[in-house]
Regions:
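Positively charged n-region of N-terminal signal peptides that target proteins for export
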Residues: 1-4
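Bacterial N-terminal signal peptides
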Residues: 8-15
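Extracellular glycoside hydrolase catalytic/binding regions
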Residues: 24-25, 179-328, 332-350
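Active-site mouth of glycoside hydrolases
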Residues: 27-42, 47-240, 245-253
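Aromatic-rich peripheral "rim/lid" segments of glycoside hydrolase catalytic domains that contact
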Residues: 305-409
Length: 409
């Protein structure tokens, strides 16, 4: 009887352990599979411009602010520190809501990639967790997977506008930035370790650009990934680790054999030929190491190019997440929001030289305060999904079987 009881207890423990392990999406050879072991081809969109704003998605590029800190500086100049804090709080609360996640599901996507800025996850009770928890909860209700993407790491992994850095990828040579990044990722992993809606962790977005002299950091990339993996695995044994190549997530030559048994390799391709030549190097890598690959970003192109590239990806069983879900007044996103009245004046002002000595000249072309206030209020009014336009052509080339109506709003 005692043996039977012990055996039953051990069996229950083993079954529970197996269930705990397999409720999470994981890798199986060259495939990502769901908790039941069924192959999972990711079809997703990126929630860009939410926690990591980019100037071009506000039509502020071509001489205007591009990075989050530059956009924040512009708005602070226009409305002052306190109102700027209020603006961004409202922006983050309303840019991505439950209605957006529901629409993503309605379109036919099965996953979302969420670009993160480290500054929102500096403590367990930080604002970022409040915002991200809601998105993960809503995604779970819609049976969508969530990929967490470190888009802006401490010190900067690219040294460009997209990582909100000081203009140089200090992450690869600054010990304090590395320690900081490890701590942020371990905090995120500890927080989401038991959440199976979260599919995995995209450890660094587009590290090390192809700028002159920066290739010397390539040799540091995989060792730092190993360091991050060690820290994450101390608190989270379940989630997939997603590793991007050097030079904007294009160069897989930096990788040796996989160092973790639950890892996916991600590549990004923009404005490349929409044919087999673009994906073949990554397919070869997949075959060489028997690991899954995933396209974490692409897009910003004509609908016919996107249709051709999606066909190539799916022919090769490569999951994808196109960029982005939402931005201002554009057709190359799932939805777009209208530019508010007075925004052209803000754009023109944003392009004026910002040197201290140019202060008087800037004041001469500064819009009147009512115009400024109206334009920024218009941004907040226009970003909710109810005010956005669905780009039906874009949606239907990504997801030809989408059940959304083909006519535009």
């Amino acid at each position: 009887m005692l043996r039977t009881t012990i055996f039953a207890a051990l069996l229950a423990f083993c079954v529970t352990s197996i269930m705990a392990q397999t409720q999470f999406a994981h890798t199986q050879g060259k495939e990502i599979v769901d908790g039941a072991g069924k192959p999972l081809l990711l079809r997703g969109t990126n929630l860009g411009n939410w926690l990591v704003p980019e100037g071009y998605m506000w039509h502020l590029n071509n001489g205007g602010p591009e990075s989050p800190r530059e956009i924040e500086a512009l708005i602070t100049e226009l409305i002052g520190p306190q109102r700027t804090r209020d603006f961004w709080h409202s922006y983050r609360e309303n840019y991505i809501t439950q209605a957006d996640i529901h629409l993503i599901k309605q379109c036919g996507f099965n996953s979302i990639r969420v670009p993160l800025h480290y500054k929102f996850f500096e403590s367990d009770d930080a604002e970022g967790f409040t915002l991200l928890n809601r998105v993960v909860q809503w995604a779970g209700q819609e049976n969508l997977y969530v990929i967490l993407d470190m888009h802006a790491a401490p010190g900067g992994q690219t040294g460009s506008n997209i990582d909100d850095s000081d203009g140089y990828p200090w992450l690869f040579s600054d010990a304090s930035a590395q320690e900081h990044t490890v701590a942020v990722w371990q905090r995120l992993a500890r927080h989401y370790r038991d959440n199976s809606t979260v599919l995995g962790y995209d450890l660094l977005n587009e590290p090390i650009p192809n700028y002159p002299g920066l290739e010397r950091f390539n040799a540091s990339l995989e060792p730092f990934y190993k360091r991050l993996a060690t820290a994450i695995r101390q608190v989270d044994k379940h989630h997939i680790l997603i590793l991007g190549g050097a030079q904007w997530d294009t160069n897989f030559a930096v990788f040796g054999p996989p160092f973790d048994n639950n890892v996916v390799y991600t590549f990004h391709r923009y404005h490349a030929p929409a044919d087999q030549t673009t994906v073949q190097p990554y397919v070869d890598f997949r075959d060489r190491y028997n690991v899954p690959i995933w396209l974490g970003e692409s897009g910003e192109n004509a609908d016919d190019w996107i249709a051709k590239f999606v066909a190539v990806l799916e022919k090769n069983d490569i999951g994808w997440a196109f960029w982005p879900y939402k931005k201002m007044q554009a057709t190359t996103s799932v939805v777009s929001f209208p530019a508010p009245e007075g925004w052209d004046a803000i754009i023109q002002f944003s392009k004026q030289p910002r040197a201290t000595s140019e202060g008087a000249a800037r004041l001469k072309v500064r819009p009147e305060q009512p115009v400024i206030d109206g334009a920024l209020a218009g941004i907040l009014n226009n970003i909710p999904s109810s005010k956005c336009r669905e780009n039906q052509g874009y949606i239907h080339v990504l997801l030809p079987s989408s059940t959304l109506p083909t006519e535009s709003k």
